[in-house]
């Protein structure tokens, strides 16, 4: 019997993920011949810790072992955070990315700036200029695509201040990007 569909995996684990305090960001099921992969992306406002993700991975594995959907086919289970390349599509993504630099594509222009506070249906974006950083409000419905950018140097303290700082439990931009600590992955081969 093949690995179950994305929808079935979501049905099996969504309550467990939510009870553990995480948001289920995505599920990907990859069929690769006789050995398939199930990748589960989770996140939370407080970020992810490796030990907690390892525990969640083991609990998800137990759920999969308790149902017949997986049959005898081998598969790899990977529980991970979305990582830096994920587009910002939900309000919670904007909240969690506060203080990070992002490329924001609008209908007629592209804005690159530091994500600030979310207020209703708009977000503050701190844009650097020759006279110093400035705050611009951008309506969420006007955003066609937004992706956090990798930073290799420490952010300007004034930009961070105008952006409202870094959310509690999140890693400062250059620290996360340089160390690779932002994406947490726990995998199991079954």
Curated annotation (Swiss-Prot):
Q: Region Disordered: list its residue ranges.
A: 159-190
The principal location of this protein is: cytoplasm
* One example of a Gene Ontology biological process annotation: translation
Q: Does the keyword DNA repair apply?
A: no
Under InterPro entries, the record lists:
Ribosome_maturation_RimP (IPR003728), RimP_C (IPR028998), RimP_N (IPR028989), RimP_N_sf (IPR035956)
Alphabetical keyword list: Cytoplasm, Ribosome biogenesis
Q: Which GO terms describe its cellular component?
A: cytosol
Where, per UniProt, does this protein localize? Cytoplasm
Q: Where is the composition biased (Acidic residues)?
A: 178-190
Q: Which family does it belong to?
A: Belongs to the RimP family.
Q: What does this protein do?
A: Required for maturation of 30S ribosomal subunits.
Cross-referenced NCBIfam families: PRK00092.2-2
Instruction: Check the record and name the PANTHER family matching this protein.
Output: RIBOSOME MATURATION FACTOR RIMP (PTHR33867:SF1)
Q: What is this protein called?
A: Ribosome maturation factor RimP
- Native organism taxonomy: Bacteria, Bacillati, Actinomycetota, Actinomycetes, Mycobacteriales
């Amino acid at each position: 019997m093949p690995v179950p569909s994305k929808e079935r995996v979501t049905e099996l684990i969504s309550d467990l993920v939510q009870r553990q305090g995480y948001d289920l960001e995505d599920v990907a099921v990859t069929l690769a011949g006789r050995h398939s992969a199930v990748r589960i992306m989770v996140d939370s406002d407080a970020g992810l810790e490796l030990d907690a993700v390892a525990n969640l991975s083991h609990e998800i594995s137990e759920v999969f072992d308790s149902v017949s959907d997986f049959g005898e086919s081998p598969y790899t289970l990977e529980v991970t955070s979305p990582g830096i390349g994920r587009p910002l599509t939900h309000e919670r993504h904007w909240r969690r990315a506060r203080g990070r630099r992002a490329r924001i594509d609008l209908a007629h222009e592209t804005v690159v700036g530091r994500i600030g506070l979310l207020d209703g249906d708009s977000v503050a974006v701190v844009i650097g200029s020759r006279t110093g950083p400035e705050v611009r409000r951008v309506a969420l419905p006007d955003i066609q695509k937004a992706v956090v950018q990798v930073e290799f140097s420490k952010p300007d303290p004034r930009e961070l201040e105008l952006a409202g700082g870094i959310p509690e439990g999140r890693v400062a931009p250059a620290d996360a990007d340089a160390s690779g600590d932002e994406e947490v992955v726990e995998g199991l081969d079954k």
